[in-house]
């Protein structure tokens, strides 16, 4: 459970592929070891509906190359949900393993994040990445993902505190909680601060309710949750650490600590909020939704749609491959009806489950973990990453298991589990081999495997899973000439839907000019100028004197 969050392994053109494969590897290992069961019919129907919409969108659009990875992610979530349903029905050890794994991942990442904050990670070498001093992100390489892991760990720590009867273990909650709050400060994540507020206030309300209903003679040891004031103390502790961490980093310079802009409190000042580009981002996405409200732009097409659209107002200034809000993302790529069906169905399931009436510690932990991920999903896209898919799927299964039926023969069930695990191992092995192969073109020639040092691009054609990365490499490495203009124009037009960045746009414009498609070249140049004005100006300065005027 902990390894996908902790692994430092990255490489190749897509930074999250190895993390995704390791998450699937955890799913395969858990299938071979832990009991499983089917989730509820409603949950199965929801995952099936999502898969159907993605398939239909890919069939009628240009997202076919994204279809297999997306279906793989949905299959991973569904398999994790089966494991979670097994926990709910049989109360096996996986629920305990989920909490322990998150505790291990979160506490180790918190220590690593603080080391990164103070810029003292050189001794770890390749075991970690090194962000700019004054920021921590563990091995997740993104502050908000790091903050969400820390928040998940806080929920797991609360479960550990609630289910343990050992006074010594209960006393560890306070220092562990302090470390986790410090790590949230080091992340500088506003998402993490929002999650901390919700966790502190929500659990304080639960602790107050627990004490109100307890007998008068009950003592502190009789309560599962810490006292409400202790839980709420996490909020002023965050504020204090927001000043203390930069104060220590500056060697005791109070002025530097006050002026430090790396923390969340500074970023919540009015001047910071008015320049926040997420508002512009969502406004752009709403514009795109209004243009194609029924069927959307197609799965994986947001980045192209954003580049190709000339907005009447402010424009989000970089490549936009996610709406940073899950309902909006579903609406812009799959259409409003699909988004309403998927999100509305999920909200109906949550309402029917009545989480506010929950008492079982395992289910409460699952609700807390699910809530942390969903809060992040309203601001970014954690469900595009394997470790969060794994936790999300387990929580879905724990909260919505199928009704218990007559037990099946244990031998048949174990055989099915081993067969499913073996299937996952084959899929992971093929994907790892194919990705390693495709990654060779992104390495210097001397660093490539010997079989791929010559004619590398030709040997990479035909990849099932990573053809977009191969096409991108070909476009960016191949010069446009009159002889290959038609091929490069078709290829650049295809890659533009994968990554509409200046290097690709330039090849599309140059090939269109060589083919005599001046009007098309002018149209793409105008979009280039609006989307990337600095890169467009540099390109114009470097164009030959005899190049067509744009």
Question: What positions do the PLM features span?
Answer:
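Transmembrane signal-anchor hairpin modules in multi-pass inner-membrane enzymes, especially those
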Residues: 1-60, 64-69, 75-96, 100-103, ...
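Alpha-helical transmembrane segments of multi-pass inner-membrane proteins
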Residues: 3-6, 22-35, 51-59, 69-86, ...
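Peri-membrane helix termini and adjoining interfacial loops of integral membrane proteins
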Residues: 118-132, 253-263, 309-313
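A membrane-periplasm/extracellular boundary helix in multi-pass inner-membrane enzymes
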Residues: 186, 207-273, 281, 287-288, ...
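Transmembrane alpha-helices of multi-pass inner-membrane enzymes
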Residues: 195-203, 361-414
């Amino acid at each position: 459970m902990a390894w996908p969050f902790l692994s430092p392994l990255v490489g190749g053109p897509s930074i999250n592929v190895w993390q995704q494969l390791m998450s699937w590897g955890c799913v395969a290992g858990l299938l071979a070891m832990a009991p499983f069961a089917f989730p509820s019919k409603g949950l199965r129907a929801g995952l099936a509906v999502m898969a159907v919409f993605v398939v239909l969108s890919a069939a009628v659009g240009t997202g076919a190359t994204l279809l297999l990875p997306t279906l793989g992610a949905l299959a991973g979530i569904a398999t994790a949900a089966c494991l979670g349903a097994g926990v709910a029905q049989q109360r096996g050890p996986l629920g305990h393993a989920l909490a322990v794994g998150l505790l291990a991942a979160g506490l180790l990442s918190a220590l690593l994040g603080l080391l990164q904050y103070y810029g003292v990670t050189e001794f770890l070498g390749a075991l970690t990445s090194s962000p700019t001093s004054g920021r921590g992100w563990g091995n997740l390489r993104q502050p908000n993902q790091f903050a969400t892991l820390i928040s998940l760990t806080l929920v797991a720590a609360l479960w550990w505190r609630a289910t343990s009867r050992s006074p010594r273990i209960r006393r560890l909650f306070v220092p562990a909680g302090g470390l986790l709050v410090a790590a949230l400060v080091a992340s500088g994540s506003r998402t993490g601060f929002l999650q901390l507020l919700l966790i502190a206030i929500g659990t304080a309300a639960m602790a107050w309710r627990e004490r109100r209903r307890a007998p008068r003679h009950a003592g502190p040891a009789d309560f599962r949750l810490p006292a409400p004031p202790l839980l709420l103390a996490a909020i002023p502790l965050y504020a204090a650490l927001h000043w203390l961490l930069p104060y220590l980093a500056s060697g005791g310079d109070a002025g530097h600590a006050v002026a430090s802009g790396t923390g969340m409190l500074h970023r919540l000042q009015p001047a910071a909020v008015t320049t926040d580009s997420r508002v512009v981002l969502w406004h752009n996405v709403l514009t795109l939704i209004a243009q194609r409200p029924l069927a959307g732009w197609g799965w994986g097409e947001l980045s192209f749609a954003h580049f190709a659209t000339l907005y009447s107002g402010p424009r989000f200034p970089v490549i936009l491959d996610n709406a940073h809000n899950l309902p909006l993302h579903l609406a812009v790529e799959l259409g409003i009806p699909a988004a309403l069906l998927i999100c509305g169905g999920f909200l109906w399931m949550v309402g029917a489950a009545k989480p506010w009436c929950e008492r079982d510690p395992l289910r409460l932990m699952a609700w807390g973990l699910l809530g942390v991920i969903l809060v992040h999903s309203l601001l970014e896209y954690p469900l595009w990453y394997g470790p969060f898919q794994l936790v999300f799927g387990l929580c879905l299964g724990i909260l919505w298991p199928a009704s218990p039926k007559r037990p099946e023969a244990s031998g048949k069930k174990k055989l099915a589990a081993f067969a499913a695990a073996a299937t996952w191992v084959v899929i992971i092995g093929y994907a790892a081999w194919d990705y390693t192969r495709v990654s060779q073109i992104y390495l210097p020639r001397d660093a490539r495997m010997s079989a791929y040092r010559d004619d590398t691009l030709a040997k990479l054609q035909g990849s099932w899973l990573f053809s977009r990365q191969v096409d991108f490499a070909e476009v960016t490495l191949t010069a446009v000439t009159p002889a290959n203009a038609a091929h490069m124009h078709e290829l650049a037009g295809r890659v533009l839907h994968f990554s509409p960045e200046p290097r690709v746009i330039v090849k599309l414009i140059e090939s269109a000019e060589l083919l005599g498609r001046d009007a098309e070249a002018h149209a793409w140049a105008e979009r280039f100028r609006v989307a990337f004005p600095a890169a467009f100006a540099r390109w114009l300065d470097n164009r030959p004197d005899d190049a067509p005027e744009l």
